[in-house]
Amino acid sequence: MSFITIVNWELVQFVSVSMIHEYVSHRSVYLYRYSFPRCSN
């Protein structure tokens, strides 16, 4: 594997992990809001 391939693979992993993290955090926030509507302002 060349250096560029390794860098691209690291970048792809980083982007996918951050996207998954964003999705999971937003989903948990939405679930929290819908689960506890009395606590949301």
Swiss-Prot record:
Superkingdom of origin: Bacteria
Protein's recorded name: Uncharacterized protein YheF
